[in-house]
Amino acid sequence: MSKVGSYAARTDTGKKRRRNEDAFVLAPPLFAVADGMGGAQAGEVASKLAAAALEDTDPGRITGPERVASLIQEANRRVHERSSIDPATSGMGTTMTVALVEDGGVVIGHVGDSRAYLVRDRQIEQITEDHSLVNELLKTGRLSPEEAETHPQRSVITRAVGTDPDVDVDSFVVDTRDGDVFLICSDGLTDMVADDQILDVVEHNLGDLERAAKQLVAAANRGGGEDNITVVAFSIGGVDGSDSVDDTATMEAVALPDDKTTENVAVRAVAPPPGRARLVLAVLILVALLVSLLLWGLLR
């Protein structure tokens, strides 16, 4: 039987952004990170709407991957509905990575390029797949891992919550062991800090996930802090309820902003066009690549 041990979260605007568009959920047994996009305040609205939907949606008796997928689909409905009626948020969207601890293990739901990691036996494994243009190029052999790290379109995502009426959700169950640590984070961390560095920080702070989260955010800022940074960590087994949220990362992170609360809003570190345009651009590039591969095969 899976049981939540300690848990912690931290979010930071980073060094290059004026506002924070990330949101998180720290409500055991439910954990999540959302990284909004859309420019102005739209990205922050999207991430907060999606995060709030996770906490106030009753999935009924559904369990496992279907439950997590239904939660994300409800978040998608709310974000898309808001963007459809509010011109100021048109085209907004958000990534969403969710972990739900159940008796059968940890259920993961995922859309976008935020990530979930599992730390076990002194090893780290990325358990979600990035829905991004760069990852598609990697899978087809068009880019090397080294080229992907500096690719100018590495922030272009191919799937997001809220940009369309429906969304495909990756959902699956991870079997757990006592001592496992799960880490959910926005790309503001993973673009700045390598996986082996993340592992090193977690391994040195297994008994203090609050400290681990703080050190990971600090490492991302030392690496440049080019985007908002959000980290949620929780362990399996051990003592219940040792939660920690830093003073800038309270549960207000899932509250909807009003006209007077703009200091925590941020523009996502994305060079390409925001919102739906990013998805369209990604699709067009993929089509062009497929055509070029077909022509290359015919001419051989």
Language-model-detected regions and their locations in the chain:
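PP2C/PPM-type serine/threonine phosphatase catalytic domain
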Residues: 1-300
